[in-house]
UniProtKB/Swiss-Prot annotation:
[4Fe-4S] cluster 2 binds at C95, C99, C102. This is Lipoyl synthase. It comes from Photobacterium profundum (strain SS9). Its main location: cytoplasm. Its cofactor is [4Fe-4S] cluster. InterPro entries: Aldolase_TIM (IPR013785), Elp3/MiaA/NifB-like_rSAM (IPR006638), LIAS_N (IPR031691), Lipoyl_synth (IPR003698), rSAM (IPR007197). Keywords: 4Fe-4S, Cytoplasm, Iron, Iron-sulfur, Metal-binding, S-adenosyl-L-methionine, Transferase. Belongs to the radical SAM superfamily. Lipoyl synthase family. The keyword Lyase does not apply.
């Protein structure tokens, strides 16, 4: 038997090391021997000019900021960076959770950087962004789950960029929802996003430490406090869910007041993560979009490369995203 890994503060644990820390044994050791080959519709054409990409990466490093685009190995990084957009990840780059679908590092994070809100706001102002998405790692080590840091960032951003629209993609604030919502109450974003990620049957496998109903309640409770702010959620496909399960997730979201939806294809970051069970054809995403609109979603971005913050500004305008 191998010795347990000693988690040291500030150290990133990824891939095999991260998976070894997950109490639910269902990842690499139970993965299929043959990895599914990507179909033609999953091929990405990289931009020929990477100058803008390097400029954004340099700006992030200069201001000691993180993007979820990089930390989560998003397949759309090149496209988004090349168009001058990024989803900023606050509260560090080490997550207290260890979800086996996610490429963000796990470990014991350092205390929040008090200068991050001002650095973030200045970077956004320098980039002249009109729409920005702010997300974070899970911070179960903080009494408010990081809610005050979100508020500090929103305030600083709006002070330097008064016309900007801010979307927050928040964690579930496990065990501290009421406290977090109370803190957020005075400084709400323009869009409040929290991802369900998958069907409830797959939570033990894909989201150990999370609870499906808790996440739904977070979305519902925020909406009750701020009925004027759209709520949004994202779901991955290809983890072993059925079409019927996804439709039920959509119904649950609508029953809890959510009006904005993203559906995208799950891609395994490495062989150590949960394997892709199925590549969902574009036509099936189109069908699910029609179902979502029939259920009452006002915005539904559905397609293989759709991610929660992919072209979030266009999503908010209701434009078609695939």
């Amino acid at each position: 038997m191998s010795k347990p890994i000693k988690i040291e503060q500030g150290i990133k644990y990824r891939d095999a090391d991260k998976m070894a820390l997950i109490p639910v044994r269902n990842v690499a050791e139970e993965a299929p021997k043959e990895v599914l080959r990507k179909p033609a519709w999953m091929k990405i054409k990289l931009p020929s000019d990477s100058k803008r990409i390097q400029e954004i990466k340099s700006a992030l490093r200069k201001n000691k900021l993180h993007s979820v685009c990089e930390e989560a190995s998003c397949p759309n990084l090149a496209e988004c960076f090349n168009h001058g957009t990024a989803t900023f990840m606050i509260l560090g780059a080490i997550c207290t959770r260890r979800c086996p679908f996610c490429d963000v590092a796990h470990g014991r994070p350092l205390p929040p950087n008090a200068e991050e809100p001002s650095h973030l706001a200045q970077t956004i102002a320098d980039m002249k962004l009109k729409y920005v998405v702010i997300t974070s790692v899970d911070r179960d080590d903080l009494r408010d789950g990081g809610a005050q840091h979100f508020v500090d960032c929103i305030r600083e951003i709006r002070e330097k960029s008064p016309e900007i629209h801010i979307e927050t993609l928040v964690p579930d604030f496990r065990g501290r929802m009421d406290r977090a919502l109370d803190i957020l109450q005075g400084t709400p974003p323009n869009v409040f996003n929290h991802n369900l990620e998958t069907a409830p049957r797959l939570y033990r496998k894909a989201r150990p430490g999370a609870n499906y109903q808790w996440s739904l309640d977070l979305l519902k409770n925020f909406k009750e406090i701020h009925p004027e702010v759209p709520t949004k959620s994202g779901v991955m496909m290809g983890l072993g869910e059925t079409k019927e399960e996804i439709i039920q997730v959509l119904k649950d979201l609508r029953a809890h007041g959510v009006t904005m939806l993203t559906l995208g294809q799950y891609l395994a970051p490495s062989r150590h993560h949960l394997p892709v069970e199925r590549y969902v054809p574009p036509a099936e995403f189109d069908e699910l979009k029609e179902i979502a609109l029939e259920l009452g979603f006002t915005h539904a971005a559905c397609g293989p490369f759709v991610r929660s913050s992919y072209h979030a500004d266009l999503q908010a305008q209701g434009l078609e995203i695939k």
